[in-house]
């Protein structure tokens, strides 16, 4: 890891997490920060991160999110925490952009599951295992 803690989104390519959902990811030793964008009408089905806690903050648009049995419509300024192992799903009718922080880093948020996320000057890069 570089000595400096400063990072930039510039030059960090997004990748398609699922159809119509793109991530820009920058990681540290124990946490991953993603800028996430859903195209209108897109969703991520019910799932859980068994070993990862997730914080999300909506910055543009809206998303309907279900955590366990509770569903809410999230808009800019709304923040949500999903604890380890809790099932959740998201659907955005009109599109949404949010930031999410995940710790520890889940490999399903890394562009190539057969590679590890490492840091380089100017952003995140990947190396084969």
What are these regions (language model features)?
Residues 1-30, 113-129:
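A short, N-terminal "cap"/entry segment at the start of jelly-roll beta-barrel domains
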Residues 29, 66-70:
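Short strand-coil-strand connectors
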Residues 43-45, 80, 84-89:
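Histidine-centered metal-chelating micro-motifs
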Residues 51-63:
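Glycine- and acidic-residue-biased ligand/ion/polar-headgroup-sensing regions
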Residues 69-84:
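Short acidic-glycine-tyrosine-enriched beta hairpin
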Residues 84-108:
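Ligand-binding loop in jelly-roll beta-barrel domains
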